């Protein structure tokens, strides 16, 4: 039996020591950790000695909203089979999903406002009237 632990806006926690341990040791006990960072530099700044270990122990790398060449180049280097130009020119409704030991794929981003599986599963948002 496994447990999924979602850490949205993970960088807001600051340097969170248990993240390293949970991504490496505790996965053997059935804990899956999904930390969400805004960009790679947040991970590198908070974990300068361990960011690569954390990244290497992630089962999936999901990327969307590539803002500039620096972000595109760094992400392309990590993914390996997608180039920076492709990332920079990616449509706003697309994402790259890189699963460990598999070729990265482009996929459509889900949109809860219009996708049928989400209908009736959320309250109206006055920001999207």
Language model features with spans:
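Conserved P-loop NTPase motor cores
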Residues: 1-89, 101-105, 110-123
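Glycine-centered loop/turn motifs
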Residues: 92-94
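Conserved active-site motif detector
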Residues: 97
């Amino acid at each position: 039996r496994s447990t999924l632990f979602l850490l949205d806006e993970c960088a807001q926690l600051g340097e969170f020591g248990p993240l390293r341990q949970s991504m490496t040791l505790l996965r053997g006990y059935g804990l899956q950790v999904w930390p969400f960072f805004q960009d790679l530099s947040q991970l590198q700044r908070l974990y300068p000695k361990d960011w690569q270990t954390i990244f290497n122990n992630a089962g999936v790398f999901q990327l969307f909203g590539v803002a500039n060449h620096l972000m595109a180049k760094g992400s392309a280097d990590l993914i390996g089979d997608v180039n920076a130009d492709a990332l920079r020119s990616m449509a706003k409704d697309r994402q790259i999903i890189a699963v460990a030991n598999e070729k990265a794929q482009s996929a459509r981003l889900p949109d809860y406002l219009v996708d049928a599986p989400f209908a009736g599963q959320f309250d109206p948002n006055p920001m999207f009237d």
